[in-house]
């Protein structure tokens, strides 16, 4: 498992045979998410049946999660990176996002022409009239619409660009495949959420282990065995490469295939060691360990939460710092957001009539610094960023697309006062958050007192059926859309991965005949600089496009790009000959 897999002649292996008919098309940005664990006290049902694994290279379906914990999380910027999501600035050295492609080959595009025509009728019209600066739709991009922009300032091979971040374009932005790793063998749909980059290793969760791989070769450097399956991982990492995970109390058995996710562990990713592991009990659970859903990190505080309770620990030793207070009016900490600060979604009231409060917390004591009461009609809320404090919610369940976002709330973390509420029409913007999870937003970034969002895909200006989108921003003080606009380019779509100082690192998802690209968007001018352009030969394209953006993690750091899955399942018999990947990496010279 640890050794890199050498591709046969022609790259990643022979392409899969053509399907007998058009595969089910992949949902666009904002399509309803797969069912996740009921959150915030919802009654637990029977474990869902695992989905059938689609054939390799086909659009992926929507797998249900494994019961007992939430769906894969995405992250904020940390030293040497973490996956896609609401990346807020952190210390420099540091998320599962986009819609996935509907079509992987030109033949599938033609087969789906009828659907595409329907989309074209309304596509691409809304944006021209919705821009906050009133400028025409064509303005404000250095990428143009060709999808062929070079590294550097709109032009020649990586020179120029912004000084607002650490990521610089190499002399040659064309990448080569670094390594690829096969998925672990499983018999059920299984979470493998979590990946990080240190100065020496790419670290990825397995099923019951955490593995460090050589950054360039993919050879196994170390492995941390665990008592049970990994069920969640922090998106944050300390300066010395320490982080936290959740894992189950035991490995699954025939008699008990689903174990409780009740163990918190501290990891040292520099040495490949499990520093500590702990379970806790709550006053309402008797002697039973609390089942956790999510875990986060702020400074040296690990905070884990779930429907049954929560706790905070010291990152280095695992010593318990505090537990949330359980009140007589049925209030509890639903989950935490970490990063530069620590915040909580605290829930009171009944399931049918909840009242949510957002609190900035002292990470060491758990004491509230400030509180903001969310408006009526908000059943769940997601913490997008903790400093500045930004929260997303689907107010009155008006989003209607499964994105769980109708509005963003910019809150003063010191006073708890609302700065501004930003309406984010789900039909226009493609960010998304978990349906019940607190720290699971993706496809957006926060920095420069702005929130950066991808627009929904719409009709391009070139050949028939081409699709594209943009990245735009809103001011977190005024709530107004700014003049920022970065075009993905004809037939490409793009979404933010993280902040890099004042710049935005974004991934440009490729069309069926090109490789993907990593770009740096200047935070001041919004000019794009290509940092990496992936190979366009079919075998590599098929491997890159096999990762659906909503269920994958994307890490870019200093000329290395890693794409990994957050969910795996047993392959279908018909797809046993198809190449499957847990991780694919690219690098520039």
Question: Where in the sequence are the language-model features?
Answer:
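Repeated scaffold domains used in trafficking and secretory/extracellular systems
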Residues: 186-195, 227-241, 280-295, 327-340, ...
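Loop/turn-rich, solvent-exposed surfaces of beta-rich toroidal or solenoidal domains
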Residues: 435-473, 482-527
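Intrinsically disordered, low-complexity Pro/Gly-rich regions
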Residues: 1-106
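Blade-level signature of beta-propeller repeat domains, shared across WD40, Kelch, NHL, RCC1
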Residues: 542-589
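Acidic, serine/threonine- and glycine-rich low-complexity intrinsically disordered segments
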Residues: 322-462, 468-470, 474-475
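Aromatic (tryptophan-biased) beta-strands that constitute blades/sheets of beta-rich domains
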Residues: 106-107, 129, 135-201, 205-232, ...
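Blade-loop segments of beta-propeller domains
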Residues: 220-263, 282
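Structural motif
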Residues: 209-211, 252-264, 308-311, 352-359, ...
